[in-house]
């Protein structure tokens, strides 16, 4: 990652291709969250996913180094000069959305974020939380999500994103009921 930042002086952050201890690649290159993305993430089926394909937060795993909106923080390198300019991590976030917010602030300051496929890192997920499988979304994730939307888009947008999330979930459940 350091080599990438040294050869790309206009890049603010660089992150690795990440895979699990089972060898499976993880989706760690993302678009910024949006109202449309919230709806698609919950509805998650054919026509809706197709309609919002360019809004889906988790991008397909890139096979080449590419600029992205944000990266998973499990393996990310950033320039000190960028942090001096935009500030450090917002400590209000807990485990989720902090790197999303940081990359967004960098992007608005003119510093792109690159996914560097040549840098490869094994990530053993859920060690910090002890939750391999989520039975339900934890409160700290919801708190961080709400803080992200409110901080970066305002209370009205955060409310609309939440309503969109709920509407997508209702549509998904209705689809399951009809199919069964």
Residue ranges, per PLM feature:
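A short, conserved alpha-helix in the catalytic core of glycosyltransferases
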Residues: 61-63, 67-120
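Structural signal for membrane-spanning alpha-helices in multi-pass inner-membrane proteins
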Residues: 16, 41, 173-176
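Conserved donor NDP-sugar-binding/catalytic core segment of glycosyltransferases
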Residues: 1-31
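Active-site-adjacent helix/loop segment of glycosyltransferases
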Residues: 104-179
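Short, hinge-like loop/turn segments at secondary-structure boundaries
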Residues: 29-35, 132-133
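Short, flexible, basic/aromatic active-site loop/helix in glycosyltransferases
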Residues: 33-69
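Residues that scaffold the ATP/ADP-binding catalytic core of kinase and kinase-like folds
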Residues: 28, 38, 42, 85-86, ...
């Amino acid at each position: 990652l350091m080599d990438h930042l040294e050869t790309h002086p206009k890049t603010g952050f660089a992150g690795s291709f990440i895979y699990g201890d089972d060898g499976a690649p993880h989706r760690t290159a993302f678009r910024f969250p949006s109202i449309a993305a919230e709806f698609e993430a919950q509805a998650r089926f054919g026509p809706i996913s197709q309609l919002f394909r360019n809004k889906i937060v988790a991008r397909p795993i890139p096979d080449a180094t590419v600029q992205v909106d944000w990266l998973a923080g499990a393996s990310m390198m950033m320039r000190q000069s960028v942090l001096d300019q935009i500030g450090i991590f917002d400590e209000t976030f807990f485990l989720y959305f902090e790197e999303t917010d940081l990359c967004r602030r960098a992007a608005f300051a003119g510093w792109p974020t690159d996914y560097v496929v040549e840098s490869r890192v094994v990530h053993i997920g859920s060690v910090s939380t002890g939750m391999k499988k989520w039975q339900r979304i934890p409160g700290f994730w919801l708190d961080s999500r709400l803080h992200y939307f409110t901080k970066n888009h305002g209370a009205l947008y955060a409310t609309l994103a939440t309503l969109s999330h709920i509407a997508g979930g209702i549509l998904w459940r209705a689809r399951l009921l009809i199919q069964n």
